[in-house]
Every structure is written in C-alpha cells, then in structure tokens.
C-alpha cells in the first residue's frame, strides 16, 4: 500500500500538473493546488517540507510571532509563499519580497524586520541591511553549497547553510508522512 508520495525536483515541464495528480492524503510535500488552497484558507497543519522546517525552527526557538515584523524574500510555491501564509496566520506583520523587488525597498524592509526568511537568491542583503537582534533563517542553497546569506551577521542570529534548514527539512518530510498516515489510514 502506498501511503506517501514525494516528487524529486527539479522537474522542468508541467511540474504543477504532476503535483496535482497526487492525492492530498499522500501529498507529503503539500505541493498540489488543493494543498496550497487549504494553506491559504488558514490550514497550517501541513506545510511543504522547507516551509515546514522554518515553522519548526521558529517553534523550537519559542519565538512568539504575534506583532513581530517579518520579511520573506522569495515567493516560490514550495518555500516563500507557504512561509508567508504561515507567518500571517501566526499574527506576524509580513512583507513578501522577491528577486524583482527594488533593492532599496528590500533593504528598508530588512532593516525594519525582526525576522528575515531568505529564499530567493544569494547576496540580496548586506550586513548593514539587517536590524540589530534580528533572526535570519536562510532557506537558500546555491551551486557553491552556500545559502542566500553571503556574510555572517554579527548583530543577529541566523541559521547556517549547510546544516540549518536542510536537515530539518528532511525531518519535516518524514513527520508530514507519519502525520498524514495517522490522519487518513
């Protein structure tokens, strides 16, 4: 009996069509249109694995998101957008930016944010762009093996790459699989 399906990425053509063929009961990475719709309607029990790992990191750090200013840089359906919906549902004030956001707007938003989630590309921010005591969660992984953060912040907390979000993402996939199994089987 097949109880979980994970699609290995990248897939270059018709990716969403493939995701939409997966039964919601077996969609461990929550990438179907139906899963996305549930998330947008406020159901944050299951998130795509990388977005879920960000949620797990935030919860394990005991961060109360209510009233916090958060910046999510990246709008992909598997990382940035689900993180945006999770943070919004958790009562943070969220700004969603991306690689096409004007750099001056991005820097201003980062300087004002208590929490910065990076998921859009390396070197968009510099040390002086980060608010003192901010928390930075780097979801990026680039060809050089590094994350989206090209510096080690002295005035903020951050997750390293490799070794930060990646291992938690693997655990989140397994947890999603077990939780879906217990919910539906």
Residue ranges and their predicted role:
Residues 1, 45-139, 146-153:
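Glycine-rich phosphate/diphosphate-binding loop of Rossmann-like nucleotide-binding domains
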Residues 3-65, 107:
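Anion-binding alpha/beta catalytic cores of soluble intermediary-metabolism enzymes, centered on
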Residues 10-13, 124, 143:
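Short, small-residue-enriched loops and turns at beta-alpha junctions
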Residues 16-37, 132, 137-185:
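Rossmann-fold NAD(P)-binding glycine/threonine-rich loop
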Residues 42, 75, 161, 165:
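Conserved short-loop catalytic and cofactor-binding motifs
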């Amino acid at each position: 009996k097949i109880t979980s399906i994970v699609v290995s990425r990248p897939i270059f053509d018709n990716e969403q069509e493939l995701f939409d063929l997966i039964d919601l009961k077996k969609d461990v990475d929550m990438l179907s249109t139906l899963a996305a719709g549930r998330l947008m309607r406020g159901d944050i029990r299951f998130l795509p694995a990388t977005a879920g790992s960000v949620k797990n990191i935030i919860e394990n750090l005991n961060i109360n998101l209510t009233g916090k200013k958060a910046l999510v840089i990246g709008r992909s359906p598997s990382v940035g957008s689900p993180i945006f919906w999770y943070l919004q549902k958790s009562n943070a004030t969220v700004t969603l930016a991306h690689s096409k956001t004007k750099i001056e707007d991005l820097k201003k938003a980062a300087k004002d944010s208590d929490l910065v989630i990076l998921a859009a590309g390396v070197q968009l921010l510099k040390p002086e762009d980060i608010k003192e005591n901010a928390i930075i969660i780097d979801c990026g992984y680039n060809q050089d093996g590094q994350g989206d953060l090209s510096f080690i912040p002295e005035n903020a907390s951050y997750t390293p790459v490799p070794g930060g979000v990646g291992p938690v993402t693997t655990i989140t996939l397994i947890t999603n699989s077990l939780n879906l199994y217990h919910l539906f089987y």
